[in-house]
């Protein structure tokens, strides 16, 4: 997987002579884009994904089981292509992209998610805490700056829809894997 991503990056770099101008502000989701939250959850839930666990055990059962594991967020593993994806994002936007994440339930989660980003992705990255995924548009930087397009990379359909419906100059990309997301980003910034 890493070899495929690295060869894709080399191909894109050959097609791109310079970085994207400051006409884009990029935002990257954390869970499911950079961190393997599903894999970590399966370890504590008997192999079930969060949606399956909640279907079986009730709507708030996700938070109940996660809260029984005080270091859940900090102990999660990066997705295999997270670093390559992040390096591509960071290298192709003049304004350093923030990671925008959902706070979930409580300060401990915010602290652990922020520490995870600092440890695994970039110690200097700006972390924006949204109170929920669908509220991420409320945290857009320079939202009134003309000719500035705000791009969100997220793995959740409802967050994508909320971002795109939040105003002019909003593009949301549905993350499936690093290679596909890099291609999507490249298709936008190369225009």
Where are these regions (language model features)?
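Short catalytic/ligand-binding loop motif for oxyanion handling, primarily in non-cytosolic enzymes
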Residues: 35-37, 42-43, 98, 107-111, ...
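Substrate-recognition element of Asp-dependent hydrolases with the DxDx(T/V) motif
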Residues: 73-78, 82-117
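Short coil/turn segments at beta-strand junctions that form active-site/ligand-binding loops
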Residues: 22-24, 96-97, 147-150
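Active-site neighborhood of HAD-like aspartate-dependent phosphohydrolases
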Residues: 12-67
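Acidic, Mg2+-coordinating phosphoryl-transfer loop and its flanking beta/alpha structural elements
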Residues: 147-189
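Substrate-recognition "cap/lid" segment bordering the active-site pocket of phosphatases
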Residues: 101-150
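Hydrophobic/aromatic residues located in beta-strands of well-ordered beta-sheets
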Residues: 97-98, 127, 172
């Amino acid at each position: 997987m890493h070899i495929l991503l690295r060869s894709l990056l080399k191909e894109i770099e050959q097609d791109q002579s310079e970085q994207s101008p400051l006409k884009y502000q990029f935002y990257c989701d954390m869970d499911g884009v950079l961190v393997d939250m599903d894999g970590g959850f399966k370890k504590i839930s008997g192999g079930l994904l969060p949606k399956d666990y909640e279907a079986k055990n009730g709507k708030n059962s996700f938070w109940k089981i996660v809260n029984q594991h005080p270091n859940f967020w900090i102990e999660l593993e990066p997705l295999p292509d997270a670093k390559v994806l992040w390096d591509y994002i960071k290298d192709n936007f003049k304004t350093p992209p923030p990671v925008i994440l959902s706070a979930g339930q409580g300060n401990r989660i915010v602290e652990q998610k922020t520490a995870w980003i600092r440890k695994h992705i970039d110690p200097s990255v700006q972390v924006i805490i949204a109170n929920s995924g669908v509220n991420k548009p409320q945290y857009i930087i320079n939202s009134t700056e003309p000719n500035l397009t705000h791009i969100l990379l997220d793995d959740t359909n409802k967050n994508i829809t909320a971002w795109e419906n939040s105003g002019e100059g909003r593009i949301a990309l549905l993350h499936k894997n690093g290679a596909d997301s890099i291609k999507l980003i490249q298709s936008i910034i190369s225009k």
